[in-house]
């Protein structure tokens, strides 16, 4: 049971990694999402990835990026256009999970986003990601945050 749970968490973590890369690619190139997904699946070993979650994150974050940006803008300390591309992709993914995946504890969403930023982002981008998503979670997950205190 424990190993099955660990494997499921690892598969979701890998899905997030591939999704943030695909979101970043879309932001830079505006290539069609289905092309990004097809290329990613063809060029990578995806057998230990939660493919359904990867597909959902990639397609839904891109499809809903304007709504996600509207959630992020009030908690940013700079213009959204001034964000690094990796930071923006990570923030969009984190905002999507905070808003649409209430079954995932907000602290897990923050931790996963921090790990993505450490892996793909600049030296201190993980601190920025943490601060922005923590502020956003105060709005989207206020009851959950109050219970956690």
UniProtKB/Swiss-Prot annotation:
This is Transcription antitermination protein NusB. Involved in transcription antitermination. Required for transcription of ribosomal RNA (rRNA) genes. Binds specifically to the boxA antiterminator sequence of the ribosomal RNA (rrn) operons. PANTHER family: ANTITERMINATION NUSB DOMAIN-CONTAINING PROTEIN, N UTILIZATION SUBSTANCE PROTEIN B-RELATED. It comes from Acinetobacter baumannii (strain SDF). The keyword Cytoplasm does not apply. The keyword Iron-sulfur does not apply. One of its GO terms (biological process) is DNA-templated transcription termination. GO terms for molecular function: RNA binding. Keywords: RNA-binding, Transcription, Transcription antitermination, Transcription regulation. NCBIfam families: nusB. One of its GO terms (cellular component) is cytosol. Transmembrane segments: none annotated. Belongs to the NusB family. Coiled coil: none annotated. SUPFAM superfamilies: NusB-like. InterPro entries: NusB-like_sf (IPR035926), NusB_fam (IPR011605), NusB_RsmB_TIM44 (IPR006027).
């Amino acid at each position: 049971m424990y190993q099955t749970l660990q494997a499921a968490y690892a598969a979701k973590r890998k899905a997030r990694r591939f999704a943030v890369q695909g979101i970043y690619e879309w932001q830079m190139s505006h290539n069609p999402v289905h092309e990004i997904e097809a290329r990613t699946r063809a060029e990578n070993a995806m057998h230990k990835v939660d493919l359904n979650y990867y597909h959902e994150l990639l397609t839904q974050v891109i499809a809903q990026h304007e709504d996600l940006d509207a959630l992020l803008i009030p908690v940013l300390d700079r213009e959204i256009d001034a964000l690094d591309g990796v930071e923006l992709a990570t923030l969009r993914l984190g905002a999507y999970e905070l808003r649409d995946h209430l079954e995932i504890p907000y602290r897990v969403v923050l931790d996963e986003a921090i790990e993505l930023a450490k892996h793909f982002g600049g030296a201190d981008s993980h601190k920025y990601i943490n601060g922005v998503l923590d502020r956003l979670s105060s709005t989207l997950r206020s009851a959950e945050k109050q219970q956690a205190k």
